[in-house]
Amino acid sequence: MSSYLFTSESVSEGHPDKIADQISDAVLDEILKQDPKARVACETYVKTGMALVGGEITTSAWVDIENLTRKVICDIGYEHSEMGFDGHSCAVLNAIGKQSADINQGVDRENPLDQGAGDQGIMFGYATNETDVLMPAAITYAHRLMEKQSEVRKSGKLAWLRPDAKSQVTLKYEDNKIVGVDAVVLSTQHSEEVSQKDLHEGVMEEIIKPVLPSEWLSKETKFFINPTGRFVIGGPMGDCGLTGRKIIVDTYGGAARHGGGAFSGKEPSKVDRSAAYAARYVAKNIVAAGLADRCEIQLSYAIGVAEPTSIMVETFGTGKVANELLVSLVREFFDLRPYGLIKMLDLIQPIYRETAAYGHFGREQFPWEKVDRAEDLRIAAGLK
């Protein structure tokens, strides 16, 4: 019997890097509302008292970058100086330029289906049947802990909670099946006056226990709640934040490979984002079809070229049919050219700010989470 531990982490919407991601995606959404043909690569940097928004954007839209940035920061919960960061009073700097004409000529085409990839690169998508959302369990529950922290904070149930927080979940497996939670780490920013006793009790009763399955918890489960003790200084006052620095949190928590490209602030001509979404869509439909228990897809592209330069399917010994057959089915049922996958997943819409906290995958409101091709795949593969 094989036994092992696997761990994934998540961070809250108030983590500095996630503030940056949400600002970048809020800018993207506002532009897409006005100009569906915009080219956007928006990067944000936050530190004590300031937010710098930059990047390359070519658009006919007009967006009030300063007011939008302030709104995002305040929506997260940084709206007075005792937090160490205040969306009402922080400096907002704008350093946005235009996308290179050299890139434009490789992407834009007279026939939209010939649209080339915005860059070269590799992208991965993954799915597993160990949760109902076909995501790895460790990252799923790490995200849910952070969502619960935000819910409890914003409802006022634990008034001393502050926006910055991190979670980490270690699961124990035997013969590739989850048998329990080995360890939970939850660190949350808090106000000055709360005692460590009240903090530990509140986090355990209001955040951890309502989220983690009780049958996975035991006397052996280890809980690390604010293990350093005090966590008053947090958010951008404690650490600077930058768009695109939480790429494993954004995806599969380390349970699958990552091509290296970040998502936030990029419109769908950037295959770093759109093809990673398409790869998740493909992998999820393969698992939903019962063709594999686990599935990882790799795609690759060349700048200015429409067709993917490669498609790989890996099922880790869980496939019900050969991987070669799965590759041919992927080519038959999914249009993975940049324009094709944009249309297939309806990606030109202002949905991206919501992706920028608590993970891009495993959340049913997003179009790449549909399993509408599962039955077609199953029939084509010859499974009853």
Curated annotation (Swiss-Prot):
Stretches for region Flexible loop: 99-109
What name goes with this protein?
Answer: S-adenosylmethionine synthase
The family database entries (InterPro entries) matched by this protein are listed as: ADOMET_SYNTHASE_CS, S-AdoMet_synt_C, S-AdoMet_synt_central, S-AdoMet_synt_N, S-AdoMet_synthetase, S-AdoMet_synthetase_sfam
Known function = Catalyzes the formation of S-adenosylmethionine (AdoMet) from methionine and ATP. The overall synthetic reaction is composed of two sequential steps, AdoMet formation and the subsequent tripolyphosphate hydrolysis which occurs prior to release of AdoMet from the enzyme.
Task: Report the EC number(s), separated by commas if there are several.
Answer: 2.5.1.6
Q: Which family does the similarity line name? A: Belongs to the AdoMet synthase family.
Q: Which organism is it from?
A: Haemophilus influenzae (strain ATCC 51907 / DSM 11121 / KW20 / Rd)
Which molecular function terms from Gene Ontology are attached?
ATP binding; magnesium ion binding; methionine adenosyltransferase activity
One GO cellular-component annotation of the UniProt record comes to:
cytosol
Q: What is its main location?
A: cytoplasm
UniProt subunit comment: Homotetramer; dimer of dimers.
Q: What is the lineage of its organism?
A: Bacteria, Pseudomonadati, Pseudomonadota, Gammaproteobacteria, Pasteurellales
Query: Which biological process annotations from GO are given for this protein?
Result: one-carbon metabolic process; S-adenosylmethionine biosynthetic process
Keyword ATP-binding among UniProt keywords: yes
Localization terms from the record:
Cytoplasm
Annotated K(+) binding lies at: E43
Its recorded reaction(s) are:
L-methionine + ATP + H2O = S-adenosyl-L-methionine + phosphate + diphosphate
What UniProt keywords are attached to this protein's entry? ATP-binding, Cytoplasm, Magnesium, Metal-binding, Nucleotide-binding, One-carbon metabolism, Potassium, Transferase
Q: What class of enzyme is it?
A: transferase
Q: Which cofactor does it need?
A: Mg(2+); K(+)
Pathway assigned in UniProt? Amino-acid biosynthesis; S-adenosyl-L-methionine biosynthesis; S-adenosyl-L-methionine from L-methionine: step 1/1
- What does this protein's record comment on cofactor binding? Binds 2 divalent ions per subunit. Binds 1 potassium ion per subunit.
Q: What residues does Mg(2+) bind to?
A: D17
